[in-house]
């Protein structure tokens, strides 16, 4: 049925082009030979001009001033961005390729993990296995997103109202908003966590679990039912109050996509920060970054605490902070995102 419909559409388009060509030719001819035209000439001219515009300008994937998905703006971006990659794990796309599964298992060197397929099957008996309808992009839209990091450069930035003006506000790990609203805003739609970085969330916030091991998926099951898991490599919350329908799972294959395509294999695996940035490229039309990088004095610390050792992660080799920062810098230079550097 679909091929027949496609052929009919193609045939109709061909006839339309032929009609415009013949009519334009006739009118040009009649202008020199006949004093009156059988058809309103202005109407055909306008139709012809509109058709030319349609053929000249490529389809824009959104109605924003900047559209992330727009192709042929940057070869660097086009080589990395893969629209077909699905950021969230669902019951329908839960199968992992063998190489992806083996790579993912090595991230935190989990010993004797339980069967992943069985774990995922049990997981989606507890939480919904479909994609968050809020994340599904409309055919034509302008979805503006703020990705808010944890950098101390947010202190006294007064970005709060600007951040809250976005359609989606994505935060990560232990970042609080209470008491810091003037600088970081009060709105949160989605919050990225893993078990060891979990913090209590407001009822309306969707939790996006970033799983780095099978135990992380098992923790979601446990934390919403029996509470049997209270320790991974550090203590973790045994129970969480997040509504089950508000729990989403970051796809392990998407983590590998970020590592392979965007980080080119730098570091051992991507940080939550860069994972949230690339995630946003796939669900948003415009992306603004806040709270990424060091402050103006070169200090790496969180906006909610005075922690001199906050930048120690840069020396562990787990994440390549410099390479990740370079990726966001290039994205900003080609107008795919904007970076607000604070103070």
Curated annotation (Swiss-Prot):
One of its GO terms (cellular component) is Golgi medial cisterna membrane. Residues 28-343 are lumenal. CDD domains: GT29_ST3GAL1 (cd23980). One of its GO terms (molecular function) is beta-D-galactosyl-(1->3)-N-acetyl-beta-D-galactosaminide alpha-2,3- sialyltransferase. The chain crosses the membrane at residues 12-27. GO terms for biological process: ganglioside biosynthetic process via lactosylceramide; N-acetylneuraminate metabolic process; protein glycosylation; protein N-linked glycosylation; sialylation. Residues 1-11 are cytoplasmic. This is CMP-N-acetylneuraminate-beta-galactosamide-alpha-2,3-sialyltransferase 1. It is found in: Golgi apparatus, Golgi stack membrane; Golgi apparatus, trans-Golgi network membrane; Secreted. Glycans are attached at residues 28, 82, 117, 326. It catalyses: a beta-D-galactosyl-(1->3)-N-acetyl-alpha-D-galactosaminyl derivative + CMP-N-acetyl-beta-neuraminate = an N-acetyl-alpha-neuraminyl-(2->3)-beta-D-galactosyl-(1->3)-N-acetyl-alpha-D-galactosaminyl derivative + CMP + H(+); a ganglioside GM1 (d18:1(4E)) + CMP-N-acetyl-beta-neuraminate = a ganglioside GD1a (d18:1(4E)) + CMP + H(+); ganglioside GM1 (d18:1(4E)/18:0) + CMP-N-acetyl-beta-neuraminate = ganglioside GD1a (18:1(4E)/18:0) + CMP + H(+); a ganglioside GA1 (d18:1(4E)) + CMP-N-acetyl-beta-neuraminate = a ganglioside GM1b (d18:1(4E)) + CMP + H(+). The keyword Lipid metabolism applies. Belongs to the glycosyltransferase 29 family. InterPro entries: Beta-gal_alpha2-3_sialyltrans, Glyco_trans_29, GT29-like_sf, Sialyl_trans. Pathway: Protein modification; protein glycosylation; Glycolipid biosynthesis. Its EC number is 2.4.3.4, 2.4.3.2.
